[in-house]
C-alpha cells in the first residue's frame, strides 16, 4: 500500500454480530423467524381486525417495527461482509439465504396492505385513539396508494421469488464482474485504475482511462446482458402493475411530485451553458499548463496505442473526458502556505500551518479534519463522527474483491451504521468520507423513532450527505487564499458539475433505456449509443468529442431491480442542501437543532411537505436556480485567474 494511505482501516462488525457462526447471530435469526411467524398469525386474525381494528393495528405496527428492524439489520450484516469480499461463496450463499427469508416479509406486506385498504375508514379514529401513531398518517396513506399499483398477492409473491434468481442475481453478477476486473499488465484493480482519474500526472490519467475502457469492453457482453434483463423485468412488471413509466414509479418511491421533478430538471438544463463554460475553462487551463495529454506535441498515447496527438483534440476547446477530475495545475512552485486544511492530532481547534493537499492525505488526517469540522457545526454531529471513527465503523481500504465506490448502510436494531469507501488519499476521498458520514448522521438522528418512520426517500437521503460535504468545502474555501482558494473552488465546481451535469446525463440515459427496452432487447452497442447521446445532450461542447460510452457499465445504480432513476435525487440533495446551508450561515449555531428536526421528519412526510417545513417551495424552477446561482462567484474567480495568467 502507498505510504500516503498507510493505516487505512477495515471496519469492525463485532459489536453488531460476532460472526455468521456466532450464537448472537444464530439467536437473531431465530428471533427473526419467530417474529415473522407471529406477524403471520396477527394477519390471519380476522376476528381481532373486525372487533377492534384500531387496537389490532396498534399491536401489529408495534410488532412489525421490531421484526422489520431486525430483518434490515441481518440483511445489512450479510451485505457488508459480501461487499468487502465478493469472491467469498459463503458470504454470497448467506446473502441469498436471507433474501429468500425476506420473501415472507414481502408477502406479509401485501396482506397488510389489503387489510389496511379495507379498513381505511377507521384510520381517523385510530389516530385519535392512539396519538402515538399520529405521525404514521402519511406513511399509511402511501401504503394504500401503492396498493393501486399492485398485482394479485400470488403474482407479487411469484415476482419476488423470481427476482432472487432474476434481477437480484443479475445485479450480483454485475458487482462480481466489475469488482474483480484487473489490469494484467500492472496488477491494479478496477477501483485503483478509476482512482487514477484524480492523478496530477496527465499521462497517468490518460492511460488509466484507456485501460478502464478496455477492461469494460472486454466484459461488455455479460454486463450488458445484466442491464438488459434487469430493465426488461422492470418494464414487464411496471406494465402489469399499471405504471405508465418507470419514472412514475420512481417519483412515487421518492415521495415526490412530477411538478417538482420538472422544475428541478428544467433548472439544471437552463444552467448547462454555465457548466460548459466551466469545462471549457478547465480544458484551457490544463492545456496552457501542459497538464493534458491532448495538446499538440505532447507525445500522448492515442487510443490505438500509438504515440502522438489525440485526433479529436484539433480545433476543440472542451475538456477531455479523462481530464475532468484533474487537479488545477499550479502556475509556479510555492513555498509556505496560504491556508490550512489538515487537522492536528487532536482533531479539534488546532492551529493550521499546512497547505491544502489535493492528494497525499493520510486517513488519520482525514479523520481529524472531518471530526473537527463536524464539531464546528454542532456538538452532536462532532460526537457522532468521533464515535464512528473511534469504533471502526468505516472500511476504507482498497483491495481486490471489494466493491467500488462508497456507501453507508444502517443497522436499525442496533441504532448504528457502517461506511464503506475506497480511500486513496485524495481530497475528494476526504469529502466522500464526509458525504457518507452525513448519511450515517441522518440515521443517527432518526434512530430513536419507530422503524416504520425511518424510511426516507432517495431525494431526502442525499440531503444530509451533501450538507455534510458542504461543511467541509465551505470551511476550506472560506479560509483559503490565493491559488489554494482557486484550487478548492475548482474542486467544488468539479464535484457539483458531476452532481448536476453528469447526473442529468444519467437521467437522460436511463429514460432512453426504458423507452427503447419497451420496444425490444438491448445490446452493449445499444447501451454505448444511448450513453454517448445522453452525454452529448448534457455535456455538449463542454467536453471534447470523446465520450465515456461504457459509463453504463460502471454505475451500480442502474443494476438495482428495485431502484430506478437513482440520479435526480443527487441533484435534489445538492441544491436543497445549499438552501439549508444558506440558512445555517444566517442563523448560526441555533440552526443545528432545526436541522436535526428536519432530518427526523424525512420519513414521515412528502418531499414537498418536508421542504415547506424548512421554508422552501420546491415546485418552482426559481428555487433550484437560486442554488445553482451560488456557483457563479467561483467560476468568475477562475476566469479572473485565467486572465491573470495571460498577463503574466
Put a short name on every predicted segment.
Residues 1-299, 303-348, 641-647:
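A well-structured
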Residues 200-212, 249-262, 321-334, 349-358, ...:
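Glycine- and acidic
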Residues 4-7, 14, 20, 112, ...:
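C-terminal, non-catalytic "cap/extension" segments appended to globular domains
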Amino acid at each position: 500500500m502507498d505510504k500516503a494511505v498507510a493505516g487505512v482501516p477495515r471496519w469492525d462488525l463485532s459489536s453488531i454480530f460476532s460472526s455468521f457462526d456466532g450464537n448472537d447471530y444464530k439467536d437473531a435469526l431465530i428471533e427473526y423467524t419467530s417474529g415473522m411467524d407471529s406477524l403471520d398469525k396477527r394477519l390471519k386474525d380476522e376476528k381481532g381486525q373486525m372487533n377492534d381494528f384500531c387496537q389490532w393495528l396498534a399491536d401489529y405496527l408495534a410488532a412489525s417495527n421490531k421484526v422489520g428492524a431486525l430483518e434490515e439489520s441481518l440483511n445489512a450484516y450479510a451485505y457488508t461482509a459480501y461487499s468487502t469480499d465478493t469472491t467469498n461463496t459463503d458470504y454470497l450463499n448467506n446473502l441469498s439465504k436471507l433474501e429468500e427469508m425476506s420473501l415472507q416479509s414481502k408477502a406479509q406486506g401485501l396482506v397488510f396492505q389489503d387489510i389496511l385498504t379495507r379498513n381505511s375508514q377507521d384510520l381517523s379514529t385510530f389516530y385519535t385513539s392512539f396519538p402515538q401513531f399520529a405521525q404514521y398518517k402519511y406513511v399509511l396513506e402511501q401504503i394504500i396508494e401503492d396498493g393501486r399499483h399492485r398485482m394479485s398477492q400470488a403474482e407479487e409473491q411469484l415476482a419476488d421469488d423470481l427476482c432472487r434468481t432474476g434481477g437480484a442475481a443479475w445485479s450480483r453478477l454485475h458487482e462480481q464482474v466489475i469488482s474483480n476486473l484487473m489490469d494484467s499488465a500492472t496488477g491494479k484493480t478496477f477501483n485503483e485504475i478509476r482512482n487514477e482519474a484524480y492523478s496530477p500526472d496527465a499521462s497517468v490519467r490518460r492511460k488509466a482511462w484507456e485501460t478502464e475502457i478496455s477492461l469494460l469492453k472486454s466484459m461488455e457482453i455479460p454486463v450488458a446482458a445484466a442491464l438488459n434483463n434487469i430493465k426488461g423485468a422492470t418494464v414487464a412488471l411496471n406494465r402489469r402493475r399499471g405504471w405508465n413509466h418507470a419514472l412514475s414509479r420512481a417519483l412515487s418511491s421518492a415521495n415526490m411530485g412530477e411538478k417538482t421533478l420538472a422544475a428541478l430538471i428544467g433548472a439544471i438544463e437552463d444552467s448547462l451553458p454555465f457548466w460548459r463554460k466551466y469545462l471549457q475553462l478547465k480544458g484551457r487551463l490544463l492545456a496552457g499548463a501542459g497538464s493534458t495529454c491532448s495538446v499538440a506535441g505532447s507525445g500522448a498515447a492515442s487510443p490505438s496505442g500509438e504515440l502522438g496527438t489525440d485526433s479529436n483534440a484539433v480545433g476543440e476547446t472542451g475538456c477531455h473526458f479523462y481530464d475532468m477530475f484533474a487537479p488545477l495545475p499550479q502556475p509556479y512552485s510555492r513555498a509556505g502556505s496560504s491556508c490550512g486544511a489538515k487537522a492536528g492530532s487532536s482533531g479539534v481547534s488546532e492551529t493550521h500551518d499546512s497547505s491544502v493537499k489535493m492528494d497525499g492525505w493520510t486517513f488519520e488526517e482525514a479523520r481529524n479534519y472531518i471530526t473537527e469540522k463536524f464539531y464546528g457545526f454542532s456538538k452532536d454531529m462532532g460526537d457522532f463522527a468521533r464515535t464512528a471513527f473511534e469504533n471502526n465503523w468505516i472500511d476504507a481500504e482498497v483491495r481486490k474483491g471489494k466493491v467500488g465506490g462508497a456507501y453507508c448502510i444502517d443497522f436499525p436494531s442496533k441504532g448504528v451504521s457502517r461506511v464503506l469507501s475506497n480511500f486513496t488519499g485524495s481530497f475528494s476521498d476526504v469529502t466522500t468520507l464526509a458525504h457518507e458520514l452525513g448519511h450515517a448522521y441522518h440515521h443517527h438522528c432518526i434512530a430513536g423513532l419507530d422503524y416504520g418512520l425511518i424510511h426516507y426517500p432517495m431525494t431526502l437521503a442525499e440531503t444530509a450527505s451533501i450538507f455534510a460535504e458542504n461543511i467541509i468545502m465551505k470551511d476550506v474555501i472560506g479560509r483559503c487564499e490565493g491559488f489554494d482558494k482557486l484550487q478548492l473552488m475548482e474542486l467544488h465546481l468539479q464535484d457539483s458539475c458531476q452532481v448536476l451535469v453528469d447526473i442529468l446525463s444519467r437521467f437522460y440515459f436511463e429514460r432512453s433505456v426504458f423507452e427503447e427496452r419497451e420496444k425490444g432487447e438491448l445490446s452493449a452497442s445499444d447501451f454505448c449509443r444511448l450513453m454517448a447521446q445522453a452525454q452529448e445532450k448534457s455535456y455538449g461542447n463542454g467536453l471534447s468529442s470523446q465520450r465515456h460510452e461504457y459509463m453504463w457499465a460502471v454505475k451500480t445504480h442502474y443494476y438495482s431491480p428495485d431502484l430506478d432513476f437513482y440520479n435526480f435525487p443527487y441533484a435534489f440533495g445538492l441544491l436543497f442542501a445549499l438552501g439549508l446551508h444558506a440558512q445555517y450561515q444566517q442563523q448560526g449555531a441555533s440552526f443545528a437543532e432545526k436541522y436535526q428536526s428536519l432530518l427526523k421528519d424525512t420519513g414521515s412526510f412528502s418531499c414537498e411537505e418536508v421542504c415547506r417545513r424548512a421554508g422552501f417551495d420546491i415546485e418552482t424552477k426559481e428555487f433550484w436556480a437560486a442554488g445553482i446561482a451560488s456557483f457563479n462567484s467561483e467560476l468568475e474567480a477562475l476566469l479572473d485567474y485565467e486572465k491573470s495568467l495571460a498577463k503574466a
